[in-house]
Amino acid sequence: MAFQGTSRTLTQQSSAASSDDLQKILFSPDAIKKMATECDLGRHHWMRADNAISVRPLVPQVTSNNLLSFFKSGYDAGELRSKGYMSVPQVLCAVTRTVSTDAEGSLKIYLADLGDKELSPIDGQCVTLHNHELPALISFQPTYDCPMELVGNRHRCFAVVVERHGYIGYGGTTASVCSNWQAQFSSKNNNYTHAAAGKTLVLPYNRLAEHSKPSAVARLLKSQLNNVSSSRYLLPNVALNQNASGHESEILNESPPFAIGSPSASRNNSFRSQVVNGL
């Protein structure tokens, strides 16, 4: 038998040279660029009327070709126990709308296996988001590792599928989907506990809350005006103190001013709910 004893990592199973080859396949500048341009890893994908169905593989075709050749050569030489598997613990998608809340439409998002000609959701993990529900975070957890193989002329791997429904009269972008994942490749595989697709509705970012506390505005104005040497620029309600040392003590003893829009001002806004911003 080619392998005996306890389970080992891919690096332990293969030579250092082949491990370096695998690193080059996955992390070369060209591979990283392809992950962005072909797979939209960490990038915002716009859902438009002329792109109502989007299928984004989690591995670029060139990388799939290189991985398939790498594992096959190692398997044929007796150095690896299989022709390779792709493992993705979780896919996380941040979804935001780019039209008003009264627009009638929805998005259907799920994870599929490109080896399935019908592109059905894996284990029924599928999420439908109506426009008025956005923004939202969704997640998928495949229950198996995907073999690195060719099915007909298709490279088999996991893919994020997004379908746009409705939005009559809206020809442009109605939603933005930003997907993140971390693919792993190994010569061994496993099955995993089934979990339903995650769906978390997120509060829209309340940017008005940063400007709604008068005390924050007052502190900002006070800090700006008190920097001027002339006493006529002091706020009317601030007691005039001719003693320079006492004035310095007054400034030092009070809380430092927080600029509107600064992180400190945001932290001191006690009634703000936790939100996701900048997706």
Curated annotation (Swiss-Prot):
A cellular component term, taken from the record's GO annotations: host cell plasmodesma
Main location: host cell
Keyword line: Host cell junction, Transport, Viral movement protein
Subcellular location: Host cell junction, Host plasmodesma
Pfam hit, one: 3A
Residue span of region Disordered: 255-279
Gene Ontology biological-process annotations: transport of virus in host, cell to cell
Superkingdom field: Viruses
Start-end of Polar residues biased regions: 263-279
Similarity remark: Belongs to the cucumovirus movement protein family.
Protein's job: Transports viral genome to neighboring plant cells directly through plasmosdesmata, without any budding. The movement protein allows efficient cell to cell propagation, by bypassing the host cell wall barrier. Acts by forming a tubular structure at the host plasmodesmata, enlarging it enough to allow free passage of virion capsids.
Protein name as it appears in the record: Movement protein
Organism: Cucumber mosaic virus (strain Trk7)
Taxonomic classification: Viruses, Riboviria, Orthornavirae, Kitrinoviricota, Alsuviricetes
